[in-house]
A protein has these predicted regions:
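C-terminal scaffold of the Radical SAM
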Residues: 1-282, 336-342
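A short, conserved structural fragment
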Residues: 296-306
Length: 342
């Protein structure tokens, strides 16, 4: 929504010229409520968008000032109402926990407002403070960031308040109303997760456009260059602006299926994996099983001959459980350990 109305019309016209868009498809757009008015929302509906994600982060003024993003409840509510009036069938709100000056009390007030607004979906993302990579974060005072314990308390609060309000806890960071397609897909075992979040469209190719965007086509990923100058230069020379890519190995695909199952359904059928990938699970994942046993002692999961099952206590930490099967992270840890020895 940083584009003007004319630019948005031109963009969607070009997309429709080159691609056949299904009449019953899902067409989603992420919106900054500070930059959008009712006329823009009406235009988006006219152009075919039917899903909207509203960036909120937090409604607490002190937190907003600390991250240099002041946004009133009224601005958000106005856009949300306009989306409903223009026929958007699903509206999502994005929150972030771990921001400077956040605490359980302030975030509880934000949750109360969000519950009152009653979006169809919510995402609650963990703030990653990486000032070396993101220049705007250098203005944030690290001393004002909540501790790890405080962040866990905020997440626990969010899970409790939202489930009490009738939302289904979809996974690591998503919530949805029981009749929302995400919740239905999870109940039916069709839920999928990609690098952008949860989706009802498993195994679909994803084509991305623009700087730094990531595409997923079949068993491969590729990422575009990170600067506009380089992006335009490559396009002007008839070259795809791809910076790097990877083709997944059979081992990558096996591990991806396990990570998907854990993050989407909180359980993995060992027997199904052995049949699909022709492996002996205990021998193939001996090192990983040792790590899982430690997590089992902490009550995070149950592991037997047939299933890996994430327990309620482990749902908040399902990312850490899934990371056990990421061989690239495991290799990084081994290299770090070797470096320390040297």
């Amino acid at each position: 929504t940083f584009l003007s109305h004319d630019e948005m019309r031109q963009l969607m016209g070009s997309i429709r010229e080159h691609f056949r868009l299904l009449p019953n498809g899902e067409y989603s757009i992420e919106v900054d409520p500070r930059k959008v008015d009712e006329a823009t929302v009406a235009l988006l509906g006219e152009l075919g968008f039917n899903r909207m994600s509203l960036g909120v982060q937090d409604f607490d003024l002190a937190v907003q000032e600390a991250v240099n993003r002041v946004q009133s409840i009224e601005e958000t509510e106005s856009v949300l109402r306009a989306a409903r009036a223009n026929g958007f069938k699903s509206i999502s709100v994005d929150l972030i926990y771990g921001l400077p000056k956040q605490n359980v009390i302030s975030f509880n007030r934000t949750l109360e407002e969000v519950i009152r607004l009653s979006p169809d979906r919510l995402s609650i993302y963990n703030y990653a403070h990486l000032p070396s990579l993101f220049k705007p974060q250098r203005r944030i005072a690290e001393a004002e960031l909540p501790t790890a314990d405080a962040k866990l308390q905020i997440l626990q609060l969010a899970i409790r308040r939202l489930t009490e309000a009738g939302y289904v806890y979809i996974g690591m960071d998503h919530f949805a109303k029981p009749d929302d397609e995400l919740a239905v897909a999870q109940r039916q075992g069709r839920l999928h997760r990609n690098f952008q979040g949860y989706s009802t469209h498993a195994e679909c190719d994803m084509m991305s456009f623009g700087i730094s965007s990531i595409s997923m086509v079949g068993p491969s990923y590729c990422q575009n260059v990170k600067t506009l100058d380089e992006y335009y230069d490559r396009l002007d020379n008839g070259v795809l602006p791809v910076m790097r890519g990877i083709e997944l190995t059979p081992d990558d695909l096996l591990r991806r299926s396990i990570i998907q199952a854990l993050m989407c359904h909180f359980e993995v059928s060992i027997e199904a994996l052995e049949v699909a990938h022709l492996i002996d699970f205990k021998r193939y994942f001996a090192a990983e099983i040792a790590d899982l046993r430690e997590m089992e002692k902490g009550g995070l999961l149950r592991l037997d001959d047939r299933w890996i099952s994430v327990q309620p206590r482990g749902r908040m930490l399902v990312r850490a459980i899934a990371m056990v099967f990421d061989r690239y992270l495991r290799a990084d840890r081994e290299r770090a350990r070797y470096s320390k020895v040297i």
